[in-house]
A protein has these predicted regions:
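Short, well-formed alpha-helical segments that are part of the catalytic scaffolds
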Residues: 10-26
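Acidic donor-binding/catalytic loop of UDP-sugar-dependent glycosyltransferases
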Residues: 44, 64, 82-99
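Short aromatic/hydrophobic "clamp" motif used to bind/position activated sugar donors
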Residues: 79
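Conserved donor NDP-sugar-binding/catalytic core segment of glycosyltransferases
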Residues: 91-124
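A recurrent flexible, glycine/aromatic-enriched loop bordering the glycosyltransferase active site
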Residues: 111-123, 133-151, 157-158
Length: 192
């Protein structure tokens, strides 16, 4: 079972496609809950989360503190962190499930995963941003927060969760380390 945690800040429009991409996972019983960790938005972010059946947590605390609090409140053994506007490709939840099952078989495994950057499956016609993302991955530039993060809750807790301070999402990826981050076969893109 998986809990999705979505970081938001004035995200009423970008939250909708992110949530829509998670519906297949919820209907298949793989996604148990969605938590929206909001920075105190004054737009309709809370209403969008409510209509979608998400748990809404609002705090003006730094991003790392909000994400860590949301993770602590989950009931699932696996966490998936996404930014508002991050849209999983069809099959994304199934790819996440395969990774979770494989990792769970290796008891005590300390691995995490990110979704493939846009364009990684289509090397013949990538746009400039997709090409840059592919080069970054190929040259060891590592994962970026726009790719989401899939991690076992016990591993997340052992790492101390997201740190406080600037760029908490990138900091947790660095803390995990490139060698312990797998890239899923399914991708994620930022909705425009």
């Amino acid at each position: 079972m998986l809990s999705a945690i979505i970081a938001t800040n004035e995200s009423e429009r970008s939250l909708v496609p992110t949530l829509a991409a998670l519906v297949p996972g919820a209907t298949a019983g793989l996604l148990g809950e969605v938590i929206v960790a909001d920075a105190g938005s004054r737009d309709a972010t809370a209403e969008v989360a409510d209509v979608a059946g998400c748990r809404f947590m609002s705090s003006e605390a730094p991003l790392g503190t909000r994400l860590k609090a949301a993770a602590a409140s989950t009931r699932s053994p696996w966490l998936m962190f996404l930014r508002a506007g991050c849209v999983l490709e069809p099959g994304g939840i199934e790819a996440a499930n395969r990774f979770m099952e494989a990792t769970d078989r290796l008891e005590g495994a300390t691995r995490a995963a990110v979704f493939r950057p846009p364009g990684a499956a289509d090397l013949l016609r990538p746009g400039l941003s997709e090409l840059i993302a592919l080069l970054r991955v190929a040259l060891g530039g590592g994962a970026k927060p726009d790719q989401g993060l899939l991690i076992a809750k016990r591993f997340y807790d052992a790492l101390g969760g997201h740190p406080e301070g600037a760029d908490a999402e990138m900091a947790i990826l660095r803390k995990i380390g490139r060698k312990r981050i797998a890239m899923l076969a399914s991708g994620a893109r930022i909705a425009r």
